[in-house]
Amino acid sequence: MQDVVNSEKLKFDAEVGKVLKLVIHSLYTNKDIFLRELISNASDACDKLRYESLSNQDLIDGDTDFKIVISVDQDKNRLYISDNGIGMNRQDLIDNLGTIAHSGTQRFLDAINNETSSQGVVELIGKFGVGFYSAFMVASEVIVESRKAGESIGYQWRSAGDGEFIISQLEDGQFPRGTKITLILKTEESEFVDKFRIEHIVTTYSYHINYPVYFLNDAGEEEKLNSDAAIWTKSKDEISAQEHQNFFRSVAHVGGEPWMILHNKNEGVIEYTNLLYIPSIKPFDLFHPDRKCSVKLYVNKVFITEDNVQIIPQYLRFLKGIIDSSDLPLNISRETLQNNKVIEKIKQSIVKRVLSELKKKAENDINDYKKFWENFGSVLKEGLCESMNTEFREELLSACRFYSTNSDDSLISLEDYIERMKEGQDNIYYLTGNDLDSIKKSPQLEGFVSRGIEVILLIDPVDDFWTNVVTDYQRVPLKSVIRADEDLEKLAHLKKDEEVGESKDENPDSKEKVDAFVKYAIQVLDKLVSGVRVSKKLTNSPVCLAVADGSMDIRMERFLREQKQLNYKSTKILEINPKHPIVSRMIDEYANTGENAVLDNMLHLLLGQACILEGEELEDVSSFAERMNNVLVKVYQ
């Protein structure tokens, strides 16, 4: 350890203290993770210097063999991890180790407080970039000595994790470029100065790190602990399942095994290699707006970035792994990556390949595909909302699977649906809702189910968006059943025999009574509805809401109101079922006695019922309750 001068004691940022406490006490069952995090940080430091040296060769000063060296002092119970990467100066040490300078700190604290599993905590540690502090799980004191590339003065940072740290200048100006971390281990953590224990941890977590990891033995010799080659440079046959598992865990920071592996070497107009994984477990922050892509971009095995590059679209953000291209210049700036034509071509190729593999899996093993769909189906459908050409949208829809009124709990494709369409049926019908159980009970489905017409059941929030963007599939229009009342008139030949018989029994007098009641209902409900009509879709329920063709979907309108993007609530059409006992008696009563207060109350109650079934808020809950009470009083008189 170097002698120091000009020492200054500083306090940790307040949030760091909280993170330290939580990390130390949350990972006590999985302490190995500290070494993985420190090695990962060392690798990042080498990546950064390698990247910076592309535009400034003087930074590496002839030392181009990047490496990470681990050594121990068993007598003093100390563990050392050193690298010859970018290094840090005084301000870097304060910024990187004394504060957490990103907005996700509080989210990390909230998330880790709510996480119960050890593996879940490990995932959080990696995701929020606070892995350095895990060193305090095993160390009573941590000392960081570092000299930044291109600078002559080195600095020391040391702390016991007690809320303070000391920054000093290294007296010896000969400290090598890079960083050396000294862990003064706690007495009970002496296992971490054992060479075999260290080797096991490196093999488990850091075997495929981009730089050689050495162990400095008692003879002063460096023994290599990790792989010679980047795993993605090997052929598919050369990579074992265990190697995939190790690499997947190192890049994904999630538990479980990869659900799908996509390893391809593309040698066409654009040359690149991709090694991508789809996890079998859904990440905790999949839907967080700040979630970034977890696919790293390399150029000839030189790490470039994993931030701010849309090489993987947001709707494939569940992908983990790397893309390595030889068709990008090594000195490409991160800013120019955004509009790079090679990047765009790689993106299109990756999307096409992923969708193709997903479609194959869905066709060959729907039970296994269902696991993927339950984890990531709603994310994949986000792509349907994006601006894309028809070919890509059709491919994306081909990979989608849906529940339907005919499929119980199994999933179907739109191709399956089209093959089963009834004679005279021109549309793919769908209905959106909150969950499968409630949507299957919707009155909107009754007329379709009674005719044997299949309806796609959509239960993800994103479904309300993409169904407003996608109008057809394979030139077959998509149509919400809420707008499809008139369609059922054309499909009357599909009615069940008893329904056909009932239709034939209708006489002109009954039609006049119904028409008169409809006019009365319009008069009573007035501005609360845009119209009242006899439903062609209801068979068991008395009423439902409907919207006219060209009108906004009910659920979509409600979402926009909740997001303050709409400041009005449109009126809906009330559909009535004259064959339902309640409505039938109301029609007869109006025909015999004319309007009265009870009928008035009943109409308002039926409108309220229709609104509730569609998830709409009642305009006046107090009036609804009062009308309900008045009707109940009449019942018991």
Curated annotation (Swiss-Prot):
Sequence segments annotated as region (A): 1-334
Segments for region (C): 559-637
Region (B): 335-558
Compartment(s) where it occurs, according to its Swiss-Prot or TrEMBL record: Cytoplasm
Main location as per UniProt: cytoplasm
One Pfam short name: HSP90
Record GO cellular component, one term: cytoplasm
Residue ranges of the TM segments: none
InterPro entries registered for this protein in UniProt: HATPase_C_sf, Heat_shock_protein_90_CS, HSP90_C, Hsp90_fam, Hsp90_N, Ribosomal_Su5_D2-typ_SF
Keywords for the protein's UniProt record, in alphabetical order: ATP-binding, Chaperone, Cytoplasm, Nucleotide-binding, Stress response
An MF annotation (GO) of this entry: ATP-dependent protein folding chaperone
Family recorded in the similarity comment: Belongs to the heat shock protein 90 family.
Functional summary from the UniProt entry: Molecular chaperone. Has ATPase activity.
PANTHER family assigned: HEAT SHOCK PROTEIN 90 FAMILY MEMBER
Subunit details: Homodimer.
Protein's UniProt name: Chaperone protein HtpG
Source organism phylogeny: Bacteria, Pseudomonadati, Pseudomonadota, Alphaproteobacteria, Rickettsiales
